[in-house]
Amino acid sequence: MWIVVFSLLVLTVTFFVYGALRRKAFYKRVDKLEDWKNDILQRPIPDEIGKVKGLTMSGETEEKFEVWRSDWDDIVGVILPNVEEQLFDVEDFANKYRFQKAKALLDTIEQRLHSIEEQLKIMVDDIQVLVQSEEQNRTEIGSVRELQQKLIKEAITRRGSLSSSAKVFDEKLEKANELLQAFDERTEKGNYIQASEVLEEAKELLGQIEHLLKIVPGLFVELQTNIPAELTNLKNGLRDMEEAGFFLETFAIDSQMERLEEKRVELLEQLTVLECNGMEEEINFIEESMEQMFELLEKEVEAKNEITILLPNLREDLTKTEEKLTHLKEETESVQLSYRLAEEELVFQQKLGKELKELRQQLQVIDEVTEEQKQTFSSVRSMLEEWREGLTACQNKIEQAQESLNSLRKDELKAKEELKQLKEKLLEDKRLVQKSNIPGLPETLLHRLEDGEQKLAQAIAKLSDVPLEMGRVTALVDEAQGLIHENSSILHETIEKARLAEHVIQYGNRYRSRSAEVKKRLSNAEELFRAFEYDEAIEMAVQAIEPFEKDVLEKVQHLAG
């Protein structure tokens, strides 16, 4: 029984505590919304609306003013008082523990206050836009009208230079005037925002007119005067050159000029109605195209002048080159009496003769083409440049062949001197072997030395042949020289190894009595030494000594100096 009573008591206390906490939370939220409502009431919205009274109260301005004032009156007189009543209802619901209804009503009140905030923000922003539009219009209209008057005067002053576009300028200026009149009308009616839009349109149009007044006169000069004059000059120059014998059909300049003239007429029509976008680039293209054609004609004239001078000189150069080849052949026949020339040299000279013959035929073709005016002079000049490269190549080949003949005797004397030096080298190496007192030389080295002497003998014998085949002599001398010098290097190395082997064996004798194995290895090293196997002798002696003394080879080398 007491447990039941105690449980009921606990539940009752818990309920009252929970209710007290919830009511406190609702009261706190009611106070917050009450402060928000009062903040809205205290805002200077009437002052913001009152700014509009300084404007012309008609049309759009008057309509907006009445709407804003009505909205504010509705907020102050109807909506916010209703919010006040709803806040009292929330407190009543909370006191009666009707928490769900209290929460729902609070959410509704908060949503209404948010809606009022959004409505007031839009209202204030619109008022600022309206007032600022009036101020901006009043500030800018003066400079816009000044620009209008300035452009009207410029259009009158430059009327002659505006050519056929003058009427279109008049229409654009009239359009600008109509826009400014519309601006005045909207301003007088209090439609300041509409007036601002019209003023921006007028400013943009006047800016276009100002830009066009700057560029159009110059464009007319280009299209009506400069370009036609240049095309006429180009046409006259083309006619004069054709009459002077220039072949210009390849360049198709006539058709290019027709296309440029068609483009000029098209641009002139566009300029008349002031459609100028990209026109300067189009005019630049026409002028660059004409400049390229003028340069093309100038290059043709230059090419003709160069050809007039170049052709006789090239004919003379070809004749001199043919004479040089004839002299080369005669000298070759003379040299063949003493020297045997390689077959390739004779074939090479025959090939040179064919090449010069082909160059002679090509030059005749170029002469005919030039005289009959079948090609442009610039293309003929290119042919001549290529032809001259071929002639230069032949001249270089003839000079090389001539130098080869001149160097034959020089090569012979050089070969004799080299053979003499090789003989002395062999004698020097033999004396070195005798002085070295080594037991002998390995069989492989003896064979190499014998091969070197044979190569030397072959070269000496070949140098005595008549007729002399100098190419073969040079090859044999080079072979003998390479082999003898290589043998000399191997010989010096072998002598040094023999001396080192002898020193190592002598050094090792101090350890001969240490063991039978040491004695045996040193004896084997001596046998290898006497058999001229010096590398093996060194290795065997070192193996015998190293158990007693490390790095013996380096020590012996140091002692031997």
UniProtKB/Swiss-Prot annotation:
Keyword Kinase (UniProt): no
Spans within the Extracellular topological domain: 1-3
Functional description taken from the UniProt entry: Negative regulator of FtsZ ring formation; modulates the frequency and position of FtsZ ring formation. Inhibits FtsZ ring formation at polar sites. Interacts either with FtsZ or with one of its binding partners to promote depolymerization.
Organism: Halalkalibacterium halodurans (strain ATCC BAA-125 / DSM 18197 / FERM 7344 / JCM 9153 / C-125)
Main subcellular location: membrane
GO annotation terms (biological process): division septum assembly; septin ring assembly
Cytoplasmic topology ranges: 23-561
Highest taxon in the source lineage: Bacteria
Coiled-coil segments on the chain, per record: 98-130, 166-214, 251-465
Presence of keyword Membrane: yes
Name of the protein this chain belongs to: Septation ring formation regulator EzrA
InterPro entries: EzrA
Subcellular location: Cell membrane
The family this protein is said to belong to: Belongs to the EzrA family.
GO cellular component: plasma membrane; septin ring
Alphabetical list of Pfam families matching this protein: EzrA
Residues passing through the membrane, by range: 4-22
Bilayer topology: Single-pass membrane protein
Alphabetically ordered keywords of this record: Cell cycle, Cell division, Cell membrane, Coiled coil, Membrane, Septation, Transmembrane, Transmembrane helix
